[in-house]
Amino acid sequence: PTWTYTHNGFYWAGAYVNSDFVLVTTDDGAEGYVTGRGSILSLNPKTGKLIDSLQATNVGDLRSSVCYDEETEAYYFTSKGGDLYQVKVNADGTFTKGSLRRLHLDNGADSASAPPMSTSTPVIANGRAYIGVSGTSQFTAYSGHNITVVDLSTFSIAYSVPTMGYPQTSGLLTTAYEDQDGYAYVYFFDNYTPGKLRVLRDKPGMT
């Protein structure tokens, strides 16, 4: 490899890359997901040198990839502690001071020991973020698993749709039909046997 960088572990975490910086999230370095805090790192894409880092403001490994939304000019990722994060980055790859925001997700139980964890990279379109969220028991049917829709203009949950299993991966979104009916369609799979393919039809303003 051209370079390597080690920090607490990178489990499932994919990177956002452009010519100026690489953004990647990390595990928290602690056992489980209710004690330590993961970080988001900004690295030089050519040398691997650390440009900047931010620690999450709540517990949990950070195991999603990082995505960028042009409309809000911000980057998004999720945590196993049950949060959606938003952060902004300067042109030099440093994080914009004071820009880190956190929205706690919901699985129907306000429990620190069974948080609404997410490893789902947010899929974003039209000011909406779509996220797969775990229930209180990862492999128990209908234990609070859901697809959560977040209104980014208010940085709040618009609504959620219950699922049989945990939608553990990212959704696949198409805007191909917006000119016809005004809706985006988002496809998610339950991580459950037998698996289910779910299609969510959504547009701004829906709750």
How would you label these PLM feature ranges?
Residues 1-207:
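Extracytoplasmic/lumenal domain signature
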